[in-house]
Curated annotation (Swiss-Prot):
Gene this chain is encoded by: fluC1
Protein name, UniProt field: Fluoride-specific ion channel FluC 1
Reaction(s) catalysed (UniProt annotation): fluoride(in) = fluoride(out)
One annotated GO molecular function: fluoride channel activity
Organism domain of life: Bacteria
Subcellular location: Cell inner membrane
Annotated InterPro entries: FluC
Organism: Parasynechococcus marenigrum (strain WH8102)
Taxonomic placement: Bacteria, Bacillati, Cyanobacteriota, Cyanophyceae, Synechococcales
Family that this chain belongs to: Belongs to the fluoride channel Fluc/FEX (TC 1.A.43) family.
Amino acid sequence: MAGSAPEALLVGLGAIPGAWLRLKVVNHFEPMVPKKHWGTLLVNVISSFALGLVLALDETCSASSGIALLMGVGFFGTLSTFSTFVVELLNELRAGHLLAAAALAVISIVAGLIAAAAGYGLGAYG
């Protein structure tokens, strides 16, 4: 059933609100701070937590993998944005802001990893 129409529909149904919410969150932070990093960081950390949770629940529960497709791949997959993070990092490097770029990279990766582990722990053991 991999790649079937019902699976694609589940992913698509989750993707639309996930992408819309990402746009809203990132645009909300844009006027408050001179750089867009905070909105991107927030959606990526929230998505990392949620994906960890969905993964753990999918592994430990007898629930249908449809939830993992709808929420994990669809909603939280489009809420998060690795490509925007990388472009923001590149812009910092191009501007010569090496310390800001390093801080952005470290904070994003460490916070995302902690969030994913916390979500997974909650789903698996909580």
